[in-house]
From Swiss-Prot:
Matches recorded under InterPro entries: ExoRNase_PH_dom1, ExoRNase_PH_dom2, ExoRNase_PH_dom2_sf, PNPase/RNase_PH_dom_sf, Ribosomal_Su5_D2-typ_SF, RNase_PH, RNase_PH_bac-type, RNase_PH_CS
Binding site for phosphate: R86, G124, T125, R126
HAMAP family tied to this protein: RNase_PH
Subunit organization: Homohexameric ring arranged as a trimer of dimers.
Family affiliation: Belongs to the RNase PH family.
One Pfam match: RNase_PH
This enzyme's EC code(s): 2.7.7.56
Biological role: Phosphorolytic 3'-5' exoribonuclease that plays an important role in tRNA 3'-end maturation. Removes nucleotide residues following the 3'-CCA terminus of tRNAs; can also add nucleotides to the ends of RNA molecules by using nucleoside diphosphates as substrates, but this may not be physiologically important. Probably plays a role in initiation of 16S rRNA degradation (leading to ribosome degradation) during starvation.
Protein name: Ribonuclease PH
Length: 238
């Protein structure tokens, strides 16, 4: 039996609170159960040096965890003097995922930075960051259009992500920490609104998984992500 008696295919209670902070062009507090991430989108004129003069924009991301977002305190990475490998991997994943949602040529020479700060971690922080940052990005792009800085919205569609895994032989969707830490197989899936996949990260933590189990996990992920898309659309309509 899962925590809170969730069904195998069920996503945790999901909340997307827009305009959570007043300064950023887009800001969203995303909550998947007890996992809470603040996602902000900042728009700046100009692009990185390698893109100058090409007439296209750029989307990048930063990810971090507050020291007490976990059960015991983790020192800030700034205090250590460098970011860890996990942090770098996650923020690159977030940026890749959100770049897939935008026509960078139509964005023009703007850079949008997505900051994802984990306030409380209970599994699935990277997938929650992607799903929340997508809504913050949509708000930032809408403001660029409304201000007249862009003629048309360059967003191609929504992006969402979810974790799936095999725990004690059972395929489960949207793992919380107690499940993730016991998973034989752990997978993160990122998808576009039209059903195309952006990224699949799968690892056999214990037993290797079969082709049939892979297909089962992908189907679970697609169902969970459809639920997230519905929540994103509902939030953006408010």
């Amino acid at each position: 039996m899962r925590p809170a008696d969730r069904a195998a295919q069920q996503v945790r209670p999901l909340t997307l609170t827009r305009n959570y902070t007043k300064h950023a062009e887009g800001s969203v507090l995303v909550e998947f159960g007890d996992t809470k991430v603040l996602c902000t989108a900042t728009v700046e004129e100009g692009v990185p040096r390698f893109l100058k003069g090409q007439g296209q924009g750029w989307i990048t991301a930063e990810y971090g965890m507050l020291p007490r977002s976990t059960h015991s305190r983790n020192a800030r990475e700034a205090a250590k003097g460098k970011q860890g490998g996990r942090t770098l991997e996650i923020q690159r994943l977030i940026a890749r995922s959100l770049r897939a949602a935008v026509d960078l040529k139509k964005l023009g020479e703007f850079t949008i930075t997505l900051d994802c700060d984990v306030l409380q971690a209970d599994g699935g922080t990277r997938t929650a960051s992607i799903s929340g940052a997508c809504v913050a990005l949509a708000d930032a792009l809408n403001k660029l259009v409304a201000s007249g800085k862009l003629k048309a919205n360059p967003m191609k569609g929504l992006v969402a992500a979810v974790s799936v895994g095999i725990v004690k032989g059972e395929a489960l969707c949207d793992l919380e920490y107690v499940e993730d830490s016991a998973a034989e197989t752990d997978m993160n899936v990122v998808m576009m609104e039209d059903g195309r996949m952006i990224e699949v990260q799968g690892t056999a933590e214990g037993e290797p998984f079969s082709h049939e189990e892979l297909l089962t996990l992908l189907a679970l992920a697609r169902g969970g992500i459809e639920t997230i898309f519905q929540a994103q659309k509902a939030a953006l309509e408010q």
